[in-house]
């Protein structure tokens, strides 16, 4: 009886969660993720190149963001700046779509039947849960993106390049490295869910406090400028707190180096490069992710409000 009771209770909990699922959040998240990453992909390429620059001879040497961009442009043109764009678009669109999808469902589930709003820690946990669920699905796409971005020596036009596209990369990684290869960087990626959790917690609280400050309803829709400001502040806070894990993950996924695991990456990076090694690429990352976050959240908020309003009108 106890087992049956637990099973029924679990089933009831899941059915309650699914009642709060809204496809509008998925569509809005995908829209925001795709548009922002398509616009700013070259800066993501620069960030990855800097994150893995550990002195290995085969890697190109860059003196800064502009030098990196111009060097890639001279060697490979526009296609070079968009190496790895296909898995990045798939990964970003799917990640943001699923993230908002899971996050809003979890958040709605937790607030059902409650008069009071969620606490800061509840926003944090909800976002972390959504991030972990999303990463389980999207990690292979991030490995693929990193591998494609780290092909050097004018590889865009080279017949000898190791990977020829997203699906070719996925197949080759699975063939030669198995499922484990597709999930390289998964552990630091899980730590990375703290980034999204911190960002969403800050974003929710900033929106709430701002609306309270100007005497508006807590759920009132903000203007575009207000969304941009709140999104930028929450992103900068999250990046500053969690950037080192991105360096660790990128180095684990790099096909030119072999590390036995997360501890090995941390130890070697610390020994050779010190604290600065864990923050390589943070400048291009901030330049990229702050506007990308603003685009994503502005598109998401406006598309989701539009679609959810349509749902209400159809009732």
UniProtKB/Swiss-Prot annotation:
Changing residue 260 to N: In NTD; uncertain significance. PROSITE patterns: SOLCAR (PS50920). Ubiquitous. GO terms for biological process: folic acid metabolic process; mitochondrial FAD transmembrane transport; transmembrane transport. One of its GO terms (cellular component) is mitochondrion. PANTHER family: MITOCHONDRIAL NICOTINAMIDE ADENINE DINUCLEOTIDE TRANSPORTER 1-RELATED-RELATED (PTHR45683). This is Solute carrier family 25 member 32. It comes from Homo sapiens (Human).
């Amino acid at each position: 009886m106890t087992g049956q009771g637990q099973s029924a209770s679990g089933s009831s909990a899941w059915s309650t969660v699914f009642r709060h699922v809204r496809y509008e959040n998925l569509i809005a998240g995908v829209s925001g993720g795709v548009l922002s990453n398509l616009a700013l992909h070259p800066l993501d390429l620069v960030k990855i190149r800097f994150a893995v620059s550990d002195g290995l001879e085969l890697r190109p040497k860059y003196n800064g963001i502009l030098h990196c961009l111009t060097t890639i442009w001279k060697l490979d043109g526009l296609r070079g700046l968009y190496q790895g764009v296909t898995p990045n678009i798939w990964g970003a669109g799917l990640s943001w779509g699923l993230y908002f999808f899971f996050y809003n469902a979890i958040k709605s589930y937790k607030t059902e039947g409650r008069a009071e709003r969620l606490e800061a820690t509840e926003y944090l946990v909800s976002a972390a849960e959504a991030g972990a669920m999303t990463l389980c699905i999207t990690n292979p796409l991030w490995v693929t993106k990193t591998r494609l971005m780290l092909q050097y020596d004018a590889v865009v036009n080279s017949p000898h390049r190791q990977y020829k596209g997203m699906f070719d990369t996925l197949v080759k990684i699975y063939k030669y490295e198995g499922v484990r290869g597709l999930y390289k960087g998964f552990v630091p990626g899980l730590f990375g869910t703290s980034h999204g959790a911190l960002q969403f917690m800050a974003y929710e609280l900033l929106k709430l406090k701002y609306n309270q400050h100007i005497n508006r309803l807590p759920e009132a829709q903000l203007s575009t400028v207000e969304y941009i400001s709140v999104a930028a502040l929450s992103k900068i806070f999250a990046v500053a707190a969690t950037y080192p894990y991105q360096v660790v993950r990128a180095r684990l996924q790099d096909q030119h180096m072999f590390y036995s695991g997360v501890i090995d990456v941390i130890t070697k990076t610390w020994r050779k490069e010190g604290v600065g090694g864990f923050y390589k690429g943070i400048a291009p990352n901030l330049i990229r992710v702050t506007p990308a976050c603003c685009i994503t959240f502005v598109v998401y908020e406006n598309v989701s409000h539009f679609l959810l309003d349509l749902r209400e009108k159809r009732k």
